[in-house]
């Protein structure tokens, strides 16, 4: 199973922000039968440690320009969507860190009959990372590609249902002089999940996950295969409570005898509770093995987050998140404890315009030299649609 070492909150925030009346409602344009939806986000932030380092800390103002373009087509039994997101980051006090990111994604859902469904996805990204870089002061320049699909057999209301999934991903770096060459890899994954209905709103599940990591560097100590078995349940018992729980065990076997094989309990928990239509509490917990970083063979990563999103009025919403992570770097004498806090207020100025004020604090306490840091980000964001 794959889990990013620092558990990026980009995905976590999405879990804590379900569709609601206080979000902007983009309007689509009909283009030859397709729904075309453009949006634009502009943010300005002050970041007092944008490289997340312990010494020689750099601060800067950061401007983010993020247009997005969605093209969607759907009929009775299928839907297809293509999204292009070019994003420009301008670091005003560190021009070498400024960069332009690109993301292109396509999704398709096809329902052949009530018992046969297929989901397909493909994504290509090109972006730069300013934190946890291989060389101090130089961005990691990353290119990634991924294709995947899930075939589902079984009607939605059936007693049993089976998902068969497969994916393939490539990770490459554009840094010069061989920087990050040791991290380039191809990843293939096969997943099988069996669902058994326990009630009208509850299903038990049993999942097997196999992942192969092939590093391009000859005789890489990180090339491996990972196998995980999980059991759990998912439920949508009322309009107020939804959740998914998976608990299991994971084993990672390395190709090279010089690296010790690893095993670890693993779990994924996603809970949402809505005591009111305008208020949502979320709980997220993860434990899994991530790929090695900073010279380690692998990272045993544990992360927990609690979130609260509340609409005080029809136009004003607050978002609060608290996250705690523990990371053990296998093959090194290092472990990190990360605390991550976010507080934001969103004002729906118009149907097509949201304004958000946010503050984020990250504190990493590491027992390795030069790996601890604190970081504060103050940000204002304008989200615009048609």
Protein language model features and the residues they cover:
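Gram-negative and organellar
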Residues: 22-386
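Bacterial N-terminal signal peptides that target proteins for export
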Residues: 1-9
């Amino acid at each position: 199973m794959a889990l990013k070492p620092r558990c990026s909150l980009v995905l976590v925030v999405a879990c804590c922000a379900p569709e609601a009346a206080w979000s902007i409602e983009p309007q689509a344009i009909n283009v030859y039968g397709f729904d075309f939806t453009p949006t634009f986000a502009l943010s300005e932030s002050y970041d007092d440690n944008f490289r997340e380092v312990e010494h020689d800390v750099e601060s800067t103002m950061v401007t983010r320009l993020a247009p997005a373009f969605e093209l969607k087509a759907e009929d009775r039994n299928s839907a297809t969507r293509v999204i292009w997101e070019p994003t420009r980051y301008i670091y005003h006090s560190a021009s070498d860190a400024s960069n332009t990111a690109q993301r292109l994604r396509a999704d398709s859902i096809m329902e052949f009959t009530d018992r046969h469904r297929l989901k397909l996805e493909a994504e290509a990204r090109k972006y730069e990372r300013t934190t946890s870089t291989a060389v101090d002061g130089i961005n990691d320049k990353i290119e990634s590609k991924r294709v995947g699909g899930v075939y589902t057999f079984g009607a939605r209301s059936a007693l049993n249902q089976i998902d068969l999934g497969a994916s393939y991903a490539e990770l490459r770096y554009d840094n010069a002089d061989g920087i990050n060459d040791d991290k380039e890899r191809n990843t293939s994954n096969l997943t099988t999940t069996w669902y058994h209905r326990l009630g009208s709103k509850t299903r038990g599940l049993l999942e097997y996950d196999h992942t192969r990591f092939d590093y391009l560097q000859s005789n890489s100590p990180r090339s491996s295969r990972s196998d995980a078995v999980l059991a759990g349940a998912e439920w949508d018992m009322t309009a107020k409570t939804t959740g998914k729980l998976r608990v299991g065990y994971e084993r990672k076997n390395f190709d090279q005898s010089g690296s010790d094989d690893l095993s670890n309990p693993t779990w994924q928990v996603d809970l949402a509770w809505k005591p009111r239509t305008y208020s949502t509490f979320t709980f997220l917990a993860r434990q899994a093995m991530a790929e090695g970083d900073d010279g380690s063979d692998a990272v045993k990563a544990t992360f927990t987050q609690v979130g609260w999103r509340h609409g005080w009025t029809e136009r004003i919403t607050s978002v609060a998140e608290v996250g705690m992570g523990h990371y053990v770097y296998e093959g090194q004498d290092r472990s990190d404890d990360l605390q991550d806090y976010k507080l934001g207020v969103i004002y729906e100025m118009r149907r097509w315009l949201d304004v958000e004020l946010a503050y984020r604090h990250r504190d990493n306490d590491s027992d390795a030299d030069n790996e601890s840091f604190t970081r504060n980000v103050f940000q204002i964001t304008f989200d615009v649609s048609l």
